[in-house]
């Protein structure tokens, strides 16, 4: 995920929270409700999630090369913490760089486990995560990255069996990373097959993608997909329209294939939160963001909602209230209006990682900033929950921002919406 800025204050509150009777003690509505018809809305459930990132060992495992027992213990600790904080979902990254945290017939084992891509860690993290999450009354959303292959540009560093080495024609370097080329139909089919293997074999609750589609722009560099455009793009007005169609096809087809593979598994996407600025498109948000997903990532997030191709969207509204270029309140209101009437669930990605970071603006030094986000969200009828980035920041809680959220808004456990 793109988080551009990639403790002890909560210890007393966390220690006071009880963990007994977790699944059975869930209620159907939280005890704290705001205006905007919140009581009826939250009777349907409220998502309270946390991302567990595995790429580059961001959250888990804490380092590569730990024993299977140590890795499992760390994973269980994240799940137990989620229960103590009265969360009800974990979003677990299982395909970080075109590799896998399960024994996949399509892709090698992820290097975050052993330090060596393709090396068997001696256990099945996804199977364990699903079982242990469900035993605790938590949903398990399996988080996949469709196109990212590596956070470097040297194919020889990949496992010898990696599909990117077996099919070098699928891969493009850009911005210091390797990506699968979204313009190739065979790539689109392969990445779907690789992800659907997990859907078929594990009782996950949702397939979850983040904000990576075409890569974020890098000044002075071009994504060299001219050959694919010449071969497949003749029906489109320009390359940008063709690229958007490539991503549209991936999203639409994946949603269809998930439903065909396992009934009840939802499909959610957590994009960068600005579709387009109003200055670019009158239908856009009242923002001046430096990135617009429609134009820069070729991800027409608004279309996916309006077409009903996905079950939920979780925009990463990683700004504070009153932020000049992208005010949390304005972006939230835009998404609330965009989702209304579509039947697509709306959750909000929250930047817990910014709370207490001295490099961030003054509002992020206030432990109450995130709690104010949730208070505001309760006045927006479509908002049905929040996901916090990320697990290690939930654990550290530098200035008690997460503890404040729990104290103000999560006084009871509730079920996730279905």
Predicted regions and their residues:
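Glycine-rich, aromatic-flanked loop segments that form ligand/cofactor-binding clefts
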Residues: 45-49, 87-95, 125-171, 208-210, ...
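Aromatic- and acidic-residue-enriched segments that line the glycan-binding/catalytic groove
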Residues: 102-114, 148-174, 212-234, 280-289
């Amino acid at each position: 995920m793109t988080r551009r800025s990639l403790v002890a204050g909560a210890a007393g509150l966390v220690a006071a929270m009880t963990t007994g009777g977790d699944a059975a003690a869930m209620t159907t509505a939280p005890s704290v409700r705001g205006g905007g018809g919140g009581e009826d809305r939250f009777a349907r459930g409220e998502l309270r999630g946390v991302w567990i990132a595995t790429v580059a060992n961001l959250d888990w495992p804490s380092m590569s090369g730990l024993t299977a027992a140590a890795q499992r213990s760390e994973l269980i600790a994240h799940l137990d913490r989620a229960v103590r904080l009265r969360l009800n979902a974990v979003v677990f990254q299982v395909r970080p760089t075109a590799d896998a945290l399960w024994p996949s017939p399509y892709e090698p084992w992820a290097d975050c486990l052993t330090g060596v891509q393709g090396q068997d860690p001696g256990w099945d993290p996804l199977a364990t995560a699903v079982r242990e999450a469900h035993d605790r009354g938590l949903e398990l959303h399996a988080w996949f990255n469709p196109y990212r292959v590596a956070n470097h540009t040297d194919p020889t560093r990949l496992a010898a069996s990696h599909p990117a080495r077996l099919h070098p024609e699928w891969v493009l370097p850009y911005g210091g990373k390797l990506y699968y080329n979204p313009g190739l139909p065979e790539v689109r089919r392969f990445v779907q097959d690789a992800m659907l293997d997990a859907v078929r074999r594990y009782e996950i609750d949702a397939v979850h993608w983040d904000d990576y589609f075409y890569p974020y722009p890098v000044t002075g560099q071009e994504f060299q997909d001219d050959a694919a455009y010449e071969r497949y793009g003749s029906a489109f007005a320009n390359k940008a329209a063709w690229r958007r169609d490539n991503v549209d096809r991936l999203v639409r087809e994946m949603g269809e294939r998930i439903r065909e593979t396992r009934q009840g598994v939802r499909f959610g996407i957590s994009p960068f939160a600005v579709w387009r600025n109003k200055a670019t498109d009158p239908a856009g948000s009242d923002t001046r963001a430096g990135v617009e997903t429609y134009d820069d990532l070729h991800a027409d997030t608004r279309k996916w909602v309006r077409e009903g191709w996905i079950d939920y969207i979780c925009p990463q509204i990683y700004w504070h209230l009153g932020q000049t270029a992208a005010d949390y309140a304005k972006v939230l209101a835009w998404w609330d209006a965009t989702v209304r009437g579509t039947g697509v669930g709306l959750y909000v990605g929250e930047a817990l990682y910014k709370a207490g970071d001295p490099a961030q603006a003054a509002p992020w030094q206030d432990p109450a900033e995130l709690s104010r986000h949730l208070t505001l969200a309760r006045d927006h009828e479509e908002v049905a929950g929040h996901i916090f980035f990320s697990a290690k920041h939930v654990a550290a809680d530098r200035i008690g921002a997460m503890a404040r959220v729990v104290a103000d808004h999560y006084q009871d456990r509730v079920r996730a919406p279905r």
